């Protein structure tokens, strides 16, 4: 089976260099064209890229979670010419204003129920951030989801967010983000506003956190 882009999280039991060498072999065999890694550290990116050049790195990145700006991941991608793919750019729907402390998640297929940041008390507190995005967007004709996506899109041309949705209306709303053009000063205003609001709740529980940032 041919894969145009092979992307995965790091195996905690296998050195990055070994994984990269295996991918290089698969490329030589014509089974993989490009590859990337998900939720890895800057150190791991350097190690893997030295063996088999990476095309993309995927990590969670949005206005409520900006760790990749601080831990060297974005700097490493910029330095090595690797694309960066923010997943959950609307924070699993939260920044779109569609869910709140009263939302009941399906226990069978929605892992948000297990995440500390999606517990009722955390969502209640973090609604202040959604309100800030809505206020910012209201004066510019944008929804809060479009504000969240637009903020990412203006960061760099090699940063390409991948919002997921099961609804056509949300897909169309997301695409309309491309119609807006704001100044750097406006985006800095938004960043400053959101940064002044404490984020309540961790992204993952302790066990899940062990699987990221390696």
Enumerate the predicted regions with their spans.
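Short, small-residue-biased leader/transition segments that mark boundaries at the very start
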Residues: 1-2
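Beta/alpha (TIM)-barrel catalytic core signal, keyed to glycine-rich beta->alpha loops juxtaposed to Asp/Glu
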Residues: 10-193, 197, 207-214
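Substrate/cofactor-recognition hotspot
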Residues: 200
């Amino acid at each position: 089976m041919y894969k145009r882009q092979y992307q995965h999280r790091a195996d905690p039991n296998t050195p990055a260099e070994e994984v990269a060498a295996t991918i290089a072999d698969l490329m030589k065999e014509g089974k993989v064209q490009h590859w990337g890694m998900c939720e890895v550290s800057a150190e791991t990116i350097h190690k893997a890229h030295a063996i088999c050049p990476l095309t993309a790195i995927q990590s969670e990145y949005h206005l409520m979670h900006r760790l990749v700006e601080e831990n060297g991941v974005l700097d490493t991608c910029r330095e090595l010419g690797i694309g960066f793919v923010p997943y959950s750019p609307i924070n699993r729907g939260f920044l779109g204003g569609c869910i709140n402390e009263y939302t009941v998640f399906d226990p069978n297929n929605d892992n948000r129920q297990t995440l500390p940041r999606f517990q009722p008390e955390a969502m209640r507190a973090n609604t202040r951030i959604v309100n800030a995005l809505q206020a910012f967007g209201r004066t510019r004709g944008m929804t809060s989801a479009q504000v969240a996506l637009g903020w990412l899109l203006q960061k760099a041309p090699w940063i390409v967010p991948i919002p997921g949705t099961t609804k056509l209306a949300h897909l169309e709303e997301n695409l309309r983000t491309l119609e807006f053009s704001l100044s750097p000063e406006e985006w800095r205003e938004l960043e400053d506003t959101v940064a002044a609001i404490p984020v309540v709740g961790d992204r993952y529980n302790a066990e899940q956190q062990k699987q990221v940032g390696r």
